[in-house]
A protein has these predicted regions:
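Arg/Lys-rich, alpha-helical DNA-contact motif
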Residues: 1-116
Length: 116
């Protein structure tokens, strides 16, 4: 899940078609900093997965402001992972494992909060 997968390069037009979203929806995700294109204007496999997931959440009433909350939370978690990896010689090997552990913790905490 946390290995870098840039095997797909989609243009904006291709992303809109494959993800089955309109320009306004995609622009909202970009404004919320959920996704951004590369310097060449292309999108990756992960971008496609993010757009599709956001579209599914939108079907339940989530909107761009909510997606920004998710982005901010993910950025804070990423900062914690980077801090833990700072100065480690094995950071490349440990990084994916540490990210997976924090994702599991996040999921379990969310489950606990929804149960309470």
């Amino acid at each position: 899940m946390f290995e870098r997968r840039d095997d797909l390069r989609l243009s904006r037009k291709e992303l809109l078609k494959v993800a089955e979203v309109d320009e306004q929806f995609l622009a909202g995700l970009e404004d919320a900093k959920v996704i951004s294109s590369s310097r060449s204007g292309h999108f990756t496999t992960d971008d496609l997965a993010l757009v599709k997931t956001a579209r599914e959440l939108a079907d339940f009433g989530f909107h761009a402001a909510a997606f920004r909350v998710f982005r901010n939370a993910a950025d804070r978690e990423a900062d914690l992972v980077r801090q833990a990896l700072s100065g480690r010689r094995d950071s490349d090997e440990v990084g994916a494992e540490l990210a997976a552990l924090t994702a599991r913790l996040h999921g379990l905490l969310l489950k606990s909060s929804l149960r309470d």
